[in-house]
Amino acid sequence: MEHGSGNSGRKPSWLTGRGILIAVMFLLGLGIFLYPHICDWYYQYQFNKAIAAYDRFQGIDCEGMIQAAREYNERLAKKEEQFLVPAEEREELDHLLDPWETGMMGYVDIPKIGVHIPIYHGTEERALQSGAGFWYGTSLPVGGENTHCVLAAHNGLVKAKLFTDLDKLEVGDRFTLDVLNETFTYEVDQILVT
């Protein structure tokens, strides 16, 4: 008489239809849960690569570009219709603060909410998918009196956080804009929700 293992040729219980269904459902749920985290990690990795490439060029003399941006801001402050930006002016803006012709003019750091993303010219979808976008018709981000720079970024994207947690900032929180060889530190002085 032959003694067997007791299975008599039966499949393990997890290989039954029910076991496979449970395993597939578990893996599907795990994938759905991890997808936003993996995508955010990947996009932050891409943002960090772009910022590192930008920082490698920081050693060049950028004072002329900063001065040209400040002159643009002075002209902008005198305009009555600041938000109407003709195509030729956009062309000029696209070259200001972009010595490497990548479209990137700097990056924004908001430590409280873990934001460290590039700033690109314009608010077209291409720019907003790559980081924050500079709003044409507002001051270039080089500081100065009577200037007001507006940056836009997505919030609520599944694939990247970007400005999703912006509502967690409070009056007094600080953030920085790094543009060419200069770092500009700002403090939240008011919060308006519209």
Residue ranges and their predicted role:
Residues 1-15:
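N-terminal Lys/Arg-rich, disordered targeting/topogenic segments
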Residues 12-194:
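Solvent-exposed, non-transmembrane regions of membrane-associated and secreted proteins
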